[in-house]
Amino acid sequence: MADTATTASAASAAASASNASSDAPPFQLGKPRFQQTSFYGRFRHFLDIIDPRTLFVTEKRLREAVQLLEDYKHGTLRPGVTNEQLWSAQKIKQAILHPDTNEKIFMPFRMSGYIPFGTPIVVGLLLPNQTLASTVFWQWLNQSHNACVNYANRNATKPSPASKFIQGYLGAVISAVSIAVGLNVLVQKANKFTPATRLLVQRFVPFPAVASANICNVVLMRYGELEEGIDVLDADGNLVGSSKIAARHALLETALTRVVLPMPILVLPPIVMSMLEKTALLQARPRLLLPVHSLVCLAAFGLALPLAISLFPQMSEIETSQLEPEIARATSSRTVVYNKGL
């Protein structure tokens, strides 16, 4: 009876908010504002997720947002609250608080802080004339930041041993550093390259190093899913079973996303900078090289992140005919969905 009353209260609150505002779509607690079935809808959704303006939300504003959502949930919204205000409150809460623990995520490790705090690392990765020490440092710092973001935004509903995260972190660092150092040594020993060509090629070394490290991290962190399978749900959200085939699809989609993500970030800036460095402005004012380089990296990062994470929906759909026979027998639905993970 309590659940029914809560649902009725939320419906009443939704109707009240809907009447107060027709500009925004009707508010749904815990649901995305934009449709997740299209790439554009997912792109708009993730633009909200990574919006750096939420980094400047005050403690008072956060408490107000949380309270507004609680009022909506219990049907006690004050008159005049709009759908836009409710969507804004949910955006703030989701950007700052962990969905499972309701604890504040440390600012540099929030998704909204990924670009502001990650851009200096990208700039460091792409600096020309890297030494062995600087190559190792920037690759280590990049993988350390990625590991902290992954851990801070992990699924906390099930206890997970810290050893799993340490294993994934060490594997990513070792693969990134070894590939970056190895490629730099090969480029240095390539006698066919002119000094200018060698410098240009060296600028592209971070991409294969970071991409391979990202794949290594996904496999090491989530290999257990391949052995045990992941939950698949029907259209009503009911658990159908656990599927190893769905786990393979989830890991493939996640790995592909993590390869696509660094591509524009680590490939576009070297191309753009190689052209900008030839302009009269930068040749006459070499001190502008680093600021311009930083702006180019920031623009590439800001474009690449929402595009990459919008490639696949968070809840991916797959036909039961492609899964294990026991999954197909356990449901009358033609398709099921699974969470692909971060």
Swiss-Prot record:
One GO BP annotation of this record: citrate transport
Domain of life: Eukaryota
Major subcellular site: mitochondrion
Keywords recorded for this protein, A-Z: Amino-acid transport, Membrane, Mitochondrion, Mitochondrion inner membrane, Transmembrane, Transmembrane helix, Transport
Residues covered by region (Disordered): 1-29
Topology within the bilayer: Multi-pass membrane protein
GO CC term (a single one): mitochondrion
Composition skew (Low complexity), residue ranges: 1-24
GO molecular function annotations of the record: citrate transmembrane transporter activity; monoatomic ion transmembrane transporter activity
Record function comment: Mitochondrial amino-acid transporter. Transports citrate. Does not act as a serine transporter: not able to mediate transport of serine into mitochondria. In brown adipose tissue, plays a role in the regulation of UCP1-dependent thermogenesis probably by supporting mitochondrial glycerol-3-phosphate utilization.
Family to which the UniProt record says this protein belongs: Belongs to the sideroflexin family.
Full protein name: Sideroflexin-5
Gene name in the database record: Sfxn5
